[in-house]
Amino acid sequence: IQSWDVKGNSWQSKRGWECPVIIDNMMNLELLFEATKLSGDSTFYNVAVMHADRTLKEQFRPDGSCYHVIDYSIEDGTVRHRQTAQGYSDESVWSRGQAWAIYGYTVCYRETKNRTYLDQAIKTFEFMKNLKNMPEDLVPYWDMDAPDVPAAPRDASSASVIASALYEMSTYDLPDAASYRAYADKIMESLASESYTAKLGENGRFILMHSVGSIPHNSEVDVPLNYADYYYLEALKRKTDIEKTAI
């Protein structure tokens, strides 16, 4: 599924891409799965699975981390480039991209029960978890390879997406399910602190502070973002649902 239109005068059109596909697209597959449930038409489900499978093959590095952008040839579908748009460099670890991968493949497992998808979500999470420069509060830098780490801006949106995915992951019959929940709990404790949660009526009435949209584009740097709040609230809902079940 192509992510961006490369025609016209947009910045995307100036990158020389033919068919750019971003890891963010994994977040859109849930809509296709739902479309099949609502319509009874398996076409949507099949497209989602095809996209997930191709992304699994082309977008990940051996260590479990992912590229942001894969540019495919319009002619034959081969990979032309593996790059970034919002990360520090093509080979760097853009944190929100890793978050999208963890969340997206957890959803794909939920909808298909294909263990390969869950294994990828876990592998990408373990990669992030084991990075030596992951901050103690578990809120990632916007890019884990940014040259100004540890002074680099944090990205609360990445943290909230990862936490929400981990809560879902913790509900599956996995040997490390408890550790996924514990990691998510620690993220949520950090996000709920005054370091990241704004005072009532401040921060443009957003909940979370300190997210990053795209530093390479000098866009949305150290600001509140609506999707940071969305996945934070979703994570809170999942956390409370799990706690109610445990009573």
Question: What are the residue ranges of the model-derived segments?
Answer:
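Glycan-recognition and catalytic cores of secretory/periplasmic carbohydrate-active enzymes
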Residues: 1-247
